[in-house]
Amino acid sequence: MIMKYFCTVMIAIALVGCTATPPPTQKAQQSKVSPTRTLDMEALCKAQAAQRYNTGAQKIAVTGFEQFQGSYEMRGNTFRKESFVCSFDADGQFLHLSMR
């Protein structure tokens, strides 16, 4: 008798567990930076790199732009093939220039 009720309860628990819907997966929100803001960031990066490498901004090439969770990075190089990375915060404010 106890076995009959035990089996019935176990089957009911198994069925209830199978019918529960999984919670929706959360996706990270990606904020889009405006094209004008990107151009401002590029100009600032070129100006900072030109000052650091003692050259003109027209001799600086920005080759890449990456967006991370809370920041942006712009990669580039000089006409002498010296690499650098400009870092910006989530609002697009310049943080620092790293020479590579």
UniProtKB/Swiss-Prot annotation:
Keywords: Cell membrane, Lipoprotein, Membrane, Palmitate, Signal. This is Uncharacterized lipoprotein YsaB. The gene is ysaB. It comes from the Bacteria. The keyword Protease does not apply. GO terms for cellular component: plasma membrane. A lipid is attached at residue 18 (N-palmitoyl cysteine). The keyword Lipid metabolism does not apply. It is found in: Cell membrane. Disulfide bonds: none annotated. The lineage of its organism: Bacteria, Pseudomonadati, Pseudomonadota, Gammaproteobacteria, Enterobacterales. It is a lipid-anchor. A lipid is attached at residue 18 (S-diacylglycerol cysteine). Residues 1-17 form the signal peptide. It comes from Salmonella typhi.
